[in-house]
Design a protein with these regions (language model features):
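Pocket-lining segment of extracytoplasmic ligand-binding domains
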Residues: 170, 176-219
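Structural motif
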Residues: 69-91, 200-215
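Short, low-complexity disordered leader/linker segments with a strong preference
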Residues: 1-34, 59, 63
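An alpha-beta-alpha
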Residues: 35, 53, 142-192
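Extracytoplasmic "Venus flytrap"
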Residues: 35-60, 71-80, 174-178
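Immediate post-signal peptide segment of exported/extracytoplasmic ligand-binding proteins
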Residues: 24-36, 60-67, 137, 158-166
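Periplasmic-binding protein-like
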Residues: 36-38, 89-101, 118-120, 167-170, ...
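Beta-alpha junction/loop-to-helix N-cap segments that form part of ligand/metal-binding clefts
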Residues: 76-132
Length: 219
């Protein structure tokens, strides 16, 4: 996540905290608002989103130990950990939860249908079945998207390689956000007379072989 996305996360946090501050419920000792952060795994982009959230709150006067109580939890990419964290946040009656990455948001949303949940590092909330509309989320879930501008990426490839006819796309087959972006790329590339050749991977160890396979297919 780049700095612009981190700022977007921070601004969203400030907006939601303003609403939470006005509701006057579920307060902790000394009227501290209880905020939970559930992060899928340690990763530079996810860590940046986390930092942007905390920094954004601090810039508007919301500081841990003063008027808010932050509860930072990392699931270490373990679904059972996500479930446990989500259930604990519900039991603790958090005033707001930041869910970092799609699985974290899905788990948190399944655990509570009324607790305010803000997501980040999520590509498409509708595809992830978190909301019914990205434009008007409704419900208790909202947040920021990290959707890649695939159309601009295809246009850049065309600008660099004017005669391009085939583009290779390596992505994680089990990740719905990756699937969504590849489908968008295929649809847009088709309008330019370009074929997208897919190569799926299960983990980072598969990437080199996937790239080799694409090269062998004259991509």
């Amino acid at each position: 996540m780049n700095w612009k996305k981190s700022i977007a996360v921070a601004l969203s946090a400030v907006t939601i905290m303003a609403m939470v501050a006005g509701c006057g419920s579920n307060t902790a000792t000394n009227d501290q608002k209880k905020i939970g952060v559930i992060q899928l795994v340690e990763h530079p982009s996810l860590d940046a989103a986390n930092k942007g959230f905390v920094d954004g709150l601090a810039s508007k006067g919301f500081k841990d130990g003063q008027n808010i109580k932050l509860d930072q939890q990392n699931a270490q990419a373990d679904q059972s950990n996500l479930n446990s964290i989500a259930q604990r946040f519900v039991s603790d009656k958090k005033d707001l939860v930041l869910a970092i990455a799609t699985p974290a948001a899905q788990t948190m949303a399944n655990a509570s249908h009324d607790m305010p949940i803000m997501g980040t590092a999520i590509t498409d909330y509708v595809t992830a079945k978190l909301v019914q509309s990205n434009e008007r989320p409704g419900g208790n879930v909202s947040g920021t998207s990290d959707m890649t501008p695939v159309e601009k990426e295809v246009d850049l490839i065309i600008a660099l390689v004017p005669n391009v006819k085939r583009i290779g796309a390596i992505y994680t087959s089990s990740e719905i956000n990756s699937q969504l972006q590849v489908e968008k790329m295929k649809a847009y590339a088709a309008t330019k007379g370009i074929t997208v050749v897919e190569a799926t991977v299960s983990n980072v160890n598969d990437i080199q072989q996937a790239a080799t396979n694409l090269v062998n297919q004259d991509v």
